[in-house]
Amino acid sequence: YFNNFKIIKCADIKDKAAKKCASIYGIKSLSVNELLNDNEIEIILNLTIPKAHYEVAKKALLHNKHVYSEKPMAINLNHGKELLKLAKKKKLYIGNAPDTFLGGGNQKSKEILENNSIGKINLGNAIFAFPGIQSYHPNPEPWFAKKEGGPVIDMGPYYLTALVNLLGPAKEVIGSIMK
């Protein structure tokens, strides 16, 4: 529960989707351009598909809005760097998920490591398995598109962020995917 901000409006490139969201949450729906030009809006919560994150975030920054996106910030490194540079130039905040490392389990783990309760850690490992996005997601098709990244971009950042937060930058990474 976040009581320091209030979601008051929503937008989607599909008007029907924006109206559905607005109806569910009792907020006002706008077109994307209306939202970007609305002076009442201070921050954009960007929940688009990954390949659209860069474009939406850039437009929001250019319209003097702070941005918080789902992961990833951008599909390629140069676009990510460009967004960070633009936010800094305009004195705006930009952030993105995953913020799950701020949760209780990861914070307790960090406390244990910082107190040296279990000694030096030399290796981090993360394993994720599930029945597939199609088992629960209402629109799984973009997840399988070439530039969407699939499970690596969808779930990988949660585990990698936790490992980096707990253990520091990686010196070597090994990965595998099985169908």
What residue ranges belong to the model's regions?
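N-terminal Rossmann-like dinucleotide-binding module
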Residues: Y1-Y25
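Short active-site oxyanion
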Residues: F5-K9, E42-I44, G149-G150
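Alpha-helical elements of Rossmann-like donor-binding domains used by nucleotide-donor carbohydrate transfer enzymes
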Residues: K20, E34, I43, E55, ...
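Conserved SAM-binding strand-loop segment of SAM-dependent methyltransferases
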Residues: G26-E34
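Structural detector of well-ordered beta-strand residues that form the stable sheet scaffold
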Residues: L30, Y68, Y93-G95, N125, ...
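Beta-strand-loop-alpha-helix segment that lines the small-molecule cofactor/substrate pocket
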Residues: I43, I49-P50, Y54-F101, N116
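Glycine-rich, N-terminal phosphate-binding loop of Rossmann-like dinucleotide-binding domains
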Residues: L47-T48, F128
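Predominantly a Rossmann-like dinucleotide-binding segment in NAD(P)-dependent oxidoreductases
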Residues: T100-K179
